[in-house]
């Protein structure tokens, strides 16, 4: 009996550490999901340096309380899973959002973004942001357009003067 309690305490401590280190935490509900779907989801998450864990609701509640995320405690009823990343802010939300569009049995419930409890709307808006590479491309093209127009004007001026 004491061994089981010690294992649960260790699980709470490990989850508390993960939550403290995470930039983004997503809580989602799942029902009737086949193992193959979870395997595909975990594989996709690993590619983006994200992790998914399923704990008992009691362990998740205790870890949320230990990390001062009391706003999450009410969500831990039924089948819930956690996805988190300590390196990327957008990937966990984006991946779970995309998978929830593929399978209606996955529903994003809530989460934590940079140590702040986030609503479903905040997570969905985070998930709809373009990737970092696309944002950088948009920035560079926005900066290059005026330069290209200036270059074209200077070229026309030089042709007119000749």
Curated annotation (Swiss-Prot):
SUPFAM superfamilies: Ribosomal protein L10-like. One of its GO terms (biological process) is translation. Pfam families: Ribosomal_L10. The keyword RNA-binding applies. One of its GO terms (molecular function) is large ribosomal subunit rRNA binding. Belongs to the universal ribosomal protein uL10 family. Forms part of the ribosomal stalk, playing a central role in the interaction of the ribosome with GTP-bound translation factors. Part of the ribosomal stalk of the 50S ribosomal subunit. The N-terminus interacts with L11 and the large rRNA to form the base of the stalk. The C-terminus forms an elongated spine to which L12 dimers bind in a sequential fashion forming a multimeric L10(L12)X complex. This is Large ribosomal subunit protein uL10. The lineage of its organism: Bacteria, Bacillati, Mycoplasmatota, Mollicutes, Acholeplasmatales.
